[in-house]
Amino acid sequence: MRNIYLALNQHICGALEAAFPQASLVAKQSGQSLNPQLVPATKPEFGDFQVNGALALSKILKKAPRKIAEEIIKQLVKNDDFNKLCLKPEIAGPGFINLTIQNSCLTTEICARLNDDHLGVPIAKPLKTHKSLKPIVVDFSSPNIAKEMHVGHLRSTIIGDSIARVLEFRGHPVLRLNHVGDWGTQFGMLITYLKLVAPEALTTANAINLGDLVKFYRQAKKLFDEDETFQDASREEVVRLQNGDPQSLKAWQLLCDQSRIEFEKIYKRLDIHITERGESFYNQYLQDVIDDLKSTNLLVTDNGAKCIFLDDITGKDGKPLPLIVQKTDGGFNYATTDLAAIRYRLQAYPQGDGACRLIYVTDAGQASHFFAVFQVARRANWIPNDCRIEHVPFGLVQGEDGKKLKTRSGDTVRLKDLLDEAIIRAKNDLEERLNAEGRKEDQEFINKVSRVIGIAAVKYADLSQNRITNYQFSFNRMLALQGNTAPYLLYALVRIAGINRKGGSLNATINKLTFNEPQEWMLARELLKFDEVILQVEEELLPNRLCNYLFELSQVFNRFYDQVPVLKANDSLKASRLALCQLTADTIKLGLKLLGIPTLDRM
């Protein structure tokens, strides 16, 4: 109801100004305004919206809150445009104003949504100071080369993808960046080891697979920790790599390519589109970071290392802790690379990306790192006043025992294995259901539905949780046909598709709707919340808000369909009820698309 909200807010602000002209003038002179605090109603009995500002305004206006509410209403009811929009306002409690939208306005909005691919969600507009929208960077997924993607990467990948989808839907240009770990001392160690045990992997494409590469990496790490001679050789290899030695660079590129092949298989299964821009991309800018920090007098040399001390970050003794950006041996670290990335991403195009908002989707364990890096970037004046930079943290994936999800042998769960298991279980559930119903379906149907349900269940189970908290992974819960799950929502869509098939297609344009049952109005009101939910997700970066809305919408629809005849209704009511069915399907389908979840016509 964004359009209705904006119109209401304008009317109420006008009423406040008319009721209290002197106070409004004083507020304007100080660059402020009297805030009516218009918000969506918390319960249906409070109407559609509530004006909660009377309590706060009582301190400014030196009047009782109810008296303020009465004065606001007195001005509102003089306004014909307001009366067309709203029923007569009611005062509740100490001075809250409850507002209920006219039925005619609700049906007009529903008609508009039926003919709008965006379902009422407004397209983002640039700031007054900009001619066009500036890019938003969403940094997510970010696996490490020579390591397999595990369950921890699932959260970053699908949360980041969903955030990017919502921002793109709003019309923002989005840079989906995969900050892969493709540089560092581990490559010197791995290349040195492969020269000993599998030299062909350093000269020939696809000589080994990622699984072998992971094993070699573990063996190389063990040898590195135990053998000083191997350590020295590894460090020499790192120097050759950093100096651009052709053979070392070729070996490094082959290792990256091999890992990339496996990453792409996962991304394809999850329908993830992302641009790789790894740590190595920023190597050329690392010295610029040091020079910049030096010119702003932020750098301090401490025990031979170059670092920045931040007052906001202290040790147990209360003293400031340093953020090291150049080690004693002259090498750089993750902090330097992340600072270079921030600097590049915010620099105006073509020197950089020219972004206006940076969003980093990583586990909560990196919160202190990003807090420090962001502080340095601000103190270096790299972040313009009209830009936002945010860390989007998420919790752990736990087993049903409440501990970090592991395999039986204690290893980290590979993402590939987890997705395979989800599809197998979805297939078993589907075949059991088909047998119980006596339905015959071909193998192509069974395989397709199993893939969609399996992947959808895994993604939705994660996205439906508040990302900030840990969550317990359970195949049984996520594949259930009841509760806040992907199968429940997919089944709701299939059910509506069946209704629409039986009821026939709607007219191309519907200009008038007739509702006479409480369940119809309840469904209409729920459908009109979609635009506000999307705007909320864009601001808060919490995809679970959208999941909760879709689940609530599907429940409201089921109550409507169970209690109100649709296909058996007379023609004047049938078209309106089919329109509600169609808009519900469109809303759920679009919502799931923004979550990165595929849908089905049949299950």
UniProtKB/Swiss-Prot annotation:
Keyword set includes Protein biosynthesis: yes
Quaternary structure, from the entry: Monomer.
Matching InterPro entries: aa-tRNA-synth_I_CS (IPR001412), Arg-tRNA-ligase (IPR001278), Arg-tRNA-synth_N (IPR005148), Arg-tRNA-synth_N_sf (IPR036695), ArgRS_core (IPR035684), DALR_anticod-bd (IPR008909), Rossmann-like_a/b/a_fold (IPR014729), tRNAsynth_Ia_anticodon-bd (IPR009080)
Taxonomic source organism: Prochlorococcus marinus (strain MIT 9211)
Protein name stated in the entry: Arginine--tRNA ligase
Localization (cell): Cytoplasm
Known catalytic reactions: tRNA(Arg) + L-arginine + ATP = L-arginyl-tRNA(Arg) + AMP + diphosphate
EC id: 6.1.1.19
Gene Ontology terms: cellular component: cytoplasm
